[in-house]
């Protein structure tokens, strides 16, 4: 019944005419999370279908093929049967395709000894980290695949000279060989180990070889896969994914293609798809295993994917949990050991990290991979100085590999060291001119060098000269007020000042904002703090912008709280608390959607304790978990401030910065365990929900209980056929009777309002008005009655009647993030009621949310003049000249204002 009533309420009104944008009494659209620090909205990938292409099926069913030829082709295209795998060579090859590296057929001494089978065993040994065995298995083979495997084995052993020699032999084979994809892999590997005389020419030659390999056999999945690997190495994620999908259409069991798409999913923050692909890789790792040992199959690829995803979510414990079983099965696999070191670094265990790096070096001396992973992970955790040290060590080890230089360049961009970043990115591109991420980032820092700057005491605002010049000066002024608020010792204040000016970069469109934050134009939020730098997308309308106008002051105050918190704690802060602090410092009332989310969690025993809330951020079990963690965190922050005082959150975060876990910090500061904190929080939470009308007072029966009682009484007096269907709307008369008994029962009042507003006119009756006003008293955060009341009063013929909309518009405006409509209407009402200062304040807010609206700028200038604020009027006229340079009226008005001031 409840959804039906809400639908009646939601659809009971029409929009109000407003300048620029209408006010609606329909429910507000769900607001975008202001600053998802660790997971910008994911670029969702579709899990590839596991069916083979029609062309492959036609090849497999060709009548001229012998049985053995058909069986070989079935293995080549991932369509093998149990009967096919009775042959030891086909079994070995199928296991290599599926990356089932630990299968007995690839590990036991008496396994198949045919050349191709031995090469599959060599590849398996290589992927288990057994480089010497891989070399032994390939000793008698002169095939391209053998040379390529030997090259990587020597690389893992730290024998760069032998690795180069093996890769050269593999890549020198004629392009007509069926093993051309392996030759391309070898040529690609050479880029890591030595600098070509002409990098651009060498890259083009590599692309030509891939094209030839693809053209030589259109159904060779390996040709598509190596193409995907090259594109992925160049950070061309879209084309890499397309090529990997093509490979899967030619061989649905190609674990290498699945793994690559999984890596792209992690890079795109699409952790659901990454997990789905990890499950697929787990299944492939069980290829040809007996049912009794299926549970023992461990996929190294799946473990690496899950660990990578956990590290991106800043969940080092989750990464280690994912890695441990795989490290048990593959203790020498270099990738797993590198990720293990990265997970240790993400937990700030310096001694452990160095030990793991030393163990990695014992197995693979001179290999830079672990250093790159550690540096990259620390950079994402905003530990820029530590990251720099590891990445410099990686560059020293692999001066010809572009990856460490690229990662360092990207880290320097995030740290705001643009000059150093530019130098590093230029060197990365000299080694690999086709890397898209490096190209994007270098283009960014080159463009940033041309930006205009405004310096204040605590900030440097950078912006592209043009239309953003209308906003940047206002932003600079507002930021200093934010500094005073955020750095204060007031509730929510961090009581700390960063040592250097914070750089605010006003990015001219979403694409450049995304490149600024992540090096690729595929991040879906509008502001983010990297610590010393806050990037924010210009709040403009159009296809190049994600959200259009938004309350950038609120957003920046949120982000600056992150920046100051990170500075105070040296970037070591309890995840949920820094988010909670940032939301608290938005200084905006909690809206109805948030209250409803919290109430549902409370009623369903779904509130998180201190351990669960961090897990909900990094490993959400339900789609709503992260939103709940975000909002419950801010709620708990308010509770801590109210109960222990404004200093307590800072004490807890300082303990975290000193190395305490979240649980330890709370126990030391508050004397609370996760369980006892939640136990003490819940009564406070209930009192808040009751106060806000989201929960009924203790002892008050719910609507279902009241209706059940009424229906039971009805059934005692009437025939069963006359008893109303419990799923139908109750009679209005029954609701009236119940409201007489329980006049403060907000859910009952919802029913009454729904009945009263069916077919209601824009102008309401006194009875309808009384019901809506009563709802504002019983359920203070509910925006629906305020929307309906505002529409009613604004439709009045009498001006004094229209003025009665003001408190309802103020309520709505205080909770609005994206629309200037409420503030603009309030400005008009205040101006016409001779309250010029209030009119100016609301016109300023409207023009702040939509700073490029000429209509709102004109309104703001007009009311600034009305309030006698000539400086503000001049500022808006200057902005109008920038926004509408083809309208000379703005310049004439500005000239007149200046003359008037001079006179």
Q: Where is each model-derived feature located?
A:
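Beta/coil-rich, acidic/histidine-enriched accessory regions frequently appended to metallopeptidases
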Residues: 20-75, 79-100, 123, 277-280, ...
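Zn2+-dependent metallopeptidase catalytic core
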Residues: 40-41, 45-81, 96-103, 194, ...
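Residue-level detector of the short coil/turn that links helix A to helix B
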Residues: 99, 129, 158, 198-201, ...
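Short coil turns that delineate tetratricopeptide repeat
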Residues: 112, 141, 175, 218, ...
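Alpha-solenoid helical repeat scaffolds
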Residues: 116-123, 145-152, 180-189, 222-226, ...
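Single-residue signature of alpha-solenoid repeat helices
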Residues: 134, 163, 202, 206, ...
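Juxtacatalytic substrate-recognition/specificity segment
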Residues: 204, 208-212, 242-243, 284, ...
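Amphipathic alpha-helical substructures
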Residues: 351-355, 414, 419-422, 573, ...
């Amino acid at each position: 019944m409840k959804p039906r009533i809400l639908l009646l309420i939601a659809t009971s009104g029409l929009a109000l005419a407003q300048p620029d944008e209408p006010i609606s009494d329909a429910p507000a659209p769900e607001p975008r999370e202001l600053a998802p620090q660790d997971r910008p909205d994911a670029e969702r990938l579709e899990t590839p279908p596991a069916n083979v292409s029609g062309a492959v099926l036609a090849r497999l069913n060709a009548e001229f093929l012998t049985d053995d030829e058909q069986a070989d082709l079935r293995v080549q295209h991932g369509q093998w049967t149990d009967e096919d795998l009775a042959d030891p060579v086909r079994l070995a090859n199928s296991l290599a395709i599926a990356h089932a590296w630990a299968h007995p057929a690839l590990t036991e001494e008496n396994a198949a000894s045919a050349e191709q089978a031995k090469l599959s065993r060599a590849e398996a040994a290589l992927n288990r980290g057994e480089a010497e065995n891989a070399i032994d298995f390939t000793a008698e083979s002169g095939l391209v695949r053998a040379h390529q495997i030997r090259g990587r084995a020597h690389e893992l052993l730290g024998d760069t000279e032998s690795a180069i020699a093996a890769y050269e032999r593999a890549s020198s084979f004629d392009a007509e060989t069926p093993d051309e994809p392996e030759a391309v892999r070898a040529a690609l590997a050479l880029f890591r180990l030595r600098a070509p005389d002409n990098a651009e020419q060498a890259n083009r030659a590599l692309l030509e070889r891939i094209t030839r390999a693809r053209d030589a056999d259109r159904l060779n999945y390996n040709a598509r896969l190596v193409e995907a690997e090259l594109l992925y190495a160049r950070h061309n994620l879209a084309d890499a994914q397309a090529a990997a999908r093509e490979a899967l259409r030619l061989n649905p069991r190609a674990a290498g293609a699945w793994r690559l798409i999984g890596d792209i999913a992690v890079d795109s923050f699409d952790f659901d798809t990454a997990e789905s692909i990890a499950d697929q890789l787990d299944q492939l790792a069980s290829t040809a295993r007996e049912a009794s040992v299926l549970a023992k199959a461990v996929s190294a690829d799946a473990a690496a994917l899950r660990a990578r995803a956990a590290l991106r979510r800043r969940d080092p414990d989750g990464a280690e949990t994912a890695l441990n079983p795989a490290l048990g099965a593959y203790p020498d696999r270099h990738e797993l050991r590198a990720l293990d070191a990265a997970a240790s670094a993400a937990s700030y265990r310096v001694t452990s990290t160095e030990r793991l790096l030393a163990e990695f070096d014992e197995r693979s001396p001179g290999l830079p991979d672990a250093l790159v992973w550690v540096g990259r992970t620390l950079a994402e955790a905003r530990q820029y100085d530590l990251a720099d040290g590891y990445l410099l060590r990686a560059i020293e080890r692999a001066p010809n590999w572009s990856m460490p230089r690229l990662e360092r360049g990207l880290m320097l961009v995030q740290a705001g060291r643009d000059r150093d970043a530019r130098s590093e990115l230029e060197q990365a591109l000299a080694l690999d001119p086709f890397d898209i991420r490096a190209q994007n980032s270098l283009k960014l820092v080159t463009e940033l060098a041309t930006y205009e700057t405004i310096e204040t005491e605590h900030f440097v605002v950078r912006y592209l000269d043009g239309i953003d010049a209308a906003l940047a000066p206002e932003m600079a002024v507002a930021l200093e007020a934010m500094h005073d608020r955020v750095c204060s010792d007031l509730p929510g204040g961090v009581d700390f000042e960063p040592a250097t000016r914070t750089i605010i970069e006003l990015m001219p469109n979403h694409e450049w904002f995304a490149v600024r934050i992540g090096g690729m134009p595929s991040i879906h939020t509008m502001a983010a703090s990297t610590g010393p730098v806050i990037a924010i997308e210009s709040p403009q309308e159009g296809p190049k912008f994600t959200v259009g106008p938004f309350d950038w002051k609120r957003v920046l105050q949120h982000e600056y709280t992150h920046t100051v918190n990170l500075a105070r704690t040296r970037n070591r802060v309890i995840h949920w608390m820094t988010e909670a602090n940032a939301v608290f410092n938005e200084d905006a009332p909690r809206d109805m959607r948030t209250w409803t989310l919290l109430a549902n969690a409370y009623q369903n025993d779904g509130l998180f304790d201190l351990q669960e809330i961090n897990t909900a951020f990094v490993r959400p079990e339900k789609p709503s978990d992260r939103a709940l963690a975000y909002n419950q965190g801010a709620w708990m922050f308010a509770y801590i401030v109210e109960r222990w005082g404004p200093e307590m959150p800072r004490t807890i975060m300082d303990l975290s910065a000193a190395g305490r876990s979240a649980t330890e910090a709370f126990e030391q500061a508050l004397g609370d365990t996760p369980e006892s904190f939640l136990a003490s929080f819940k009564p406070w939470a209930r009192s808040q929900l009751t106060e806000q009308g989201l929960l009924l007072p203790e002892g008050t029966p719910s609507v279902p209980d009241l209706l059940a009682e009424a229906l039971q009484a009805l059934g005692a007096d009437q025939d069963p056929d006359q008893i109303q269907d419990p799923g139908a709307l109750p009679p209005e008369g029954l609701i009236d009777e119940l409201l007489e008994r329980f006049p403060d029962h907000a859910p009952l009042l919802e029913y009454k309002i729904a009945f009263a507003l069916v077919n209601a006119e824009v102008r309401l009756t006194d009875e309808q008005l009384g019901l809506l006003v009563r709802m504002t008293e019983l359920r203070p955060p509910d925006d629906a009655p305020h929307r309906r009341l505002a529409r009613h009063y604004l439709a009045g013929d009498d001006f004094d009647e229209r003025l009665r909309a003001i408190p309802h518009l103020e309520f709505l405006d205080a909770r609005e993030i994206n629309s200037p409509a409420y503030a603009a209407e309030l400005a008009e009402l205040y101006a016409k009621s001779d309250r010029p200062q209030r009119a100016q304040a609301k016109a300023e807010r409207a023009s702040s949310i939509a700073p490029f609206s000429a209509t709102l700028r004109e309104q703001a200038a007009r009311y600034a003049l009305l309030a006698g604020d000539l400086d503000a009027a001049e500022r808006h006229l200057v902005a109008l000249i920038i926004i509408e340079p083809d309208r000379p009226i703005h310049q004439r008005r500005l000239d007149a204002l200046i003359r008037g001031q001079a006179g």
